[in-house]
Swiss-Prot record:
This is Mediator of RNA polymerase II transcription subunit 7. Keywords: Activator, Nucleus, Transcription, Transcription regulation. It is found in: Nucleus. SUPFAM superfamilies: Mediator hinge subcomplex-like. It holds the Pfam family Med7. Its main location: nucleus. The lineage of its organism: Eukaryota, Fungi, Dikarya, Ascomycota, Pezizomycotina. One of its GO terms (cellular component) is mediator complex. Residues 1-21 are annotated as: Disordered. Component of the Mediator complex. The keyword Transcription regulation applies. GO terms for biological process: regulation of transcription by RNA polymerase II. The gene is med7. GO terms for molecular function: transcription coregulator activity.
């Protein structure tokens, strides 16, 4: 029996943070900034703005407690640990055989099989095998219920069968993800192409309406070209007058400055 004064350990959903977080104090952060400022000074003695990399920070003369403030290098290969479990950096999906799990469906054709002209490979039908696994799950669940009603102590074998079926179904869905991503990209590009065509059609329609309106004005005796040239000349004249007014204003301010 535990002692009355001993605190009871409470289970948590997530692992506690590493103890190095205790070193992230305002004082330590200020010390690190001062060291970085001193190290970034140039020949003129002025500190220069610099983006420090973790390798450059480790090269500085830091105390052990300040060394915890330096971010680690980003792993590029191998494995990393998350809540005590090793995660691989490789994006390739490992096969069930590599994980020591029985595979209940045939392996999809590889690139080597597709390139072999003497052995043409059929496309892998994910939906067909997913349907077969789903039916097997229903059958094994009924058998599992029957085992529990007759001999409950022999449930372990059926639990393993159900577990293996679920793992195979999940792995088969993961194999289908590249195809799903490709189809989603195709749908997205088709939607963008459709919007672009609609915009082009609207622009063509507007161009036709404007051209018809101009033709109508010409038919009524309005010189559209001369009107456009006069508008352009008026705009240029306004720009010239505005520029001249700005120069005159600047000259007046210069004269006032000399008087002061």
């Amino acid at each position: 029996m535990a002692e009355a004064g001993q605190p009871r350990a409470l289970p948590t959903a997530f692992a506690p943070p590493p103890p190095l977080w205790k070193h992230f104090t305002p004082g330590n952060l200020k010390k690190l900034e001062e060291i970085k400022r001193e190290a970034s000074k140039g020949e003129d003695g002025k500190a220069r703005r610099k983006d420090w990399t973790p390798a450059e920070l480790r090269a500085l003369d830091l105390s052990p407690e300040l060394g915890f403030l330096v971010p680690p290098e980003i792993p590029t290969k191998g494995h990393y640990s998350v809540f005590g479990e090793l995660q691989s950096l490789s994006t390739a999906l490992p096969s069930l055989q590599e994980q020591g799990i029985e595979q209940l469906y045939p392996s999809p054709p590889t690139e080597t099989d597709r390139e072999a002209p003497s052995q043409p490979s059929r496309p892998f039908n994910h939906a067909y095998y997913l349907l077969k696994i789903s039916k097997s799950l229903l059958l094994n669940f009924l058998e599992f219920v029957g085992v529990l009603s007759v001999a409950p102590e022999q449930f372990q074998a059926k639990v393993e069968d159900l577990r293996n079926l679920f793992i195979n179904a999940h792995h088969l869905l993961n194999l289908y993800r590249p195809h799903q991503a490709r189809e989603s990209l195709i749908m997205m590009m088709e939607e963008q192409l459709k919007r672009s065509r609609e915009e082009i059609e609207q622009m063509d329609k507007l161009h036709t309406e404007i051209k018809g309106f101009l033709d109508q004005l010409k038919a009524q005796g309005v010189d559209v070209d001369s009107a456009a040239e006069s508008v352009s000349k008026a705009t240029k004249k306004d720009d010239t007058s505005n520029k001249r007014a700005a120069e005159d204003s600047g000259l007046i301010w210069d004269i006032l400055g000399e008087i002061d």
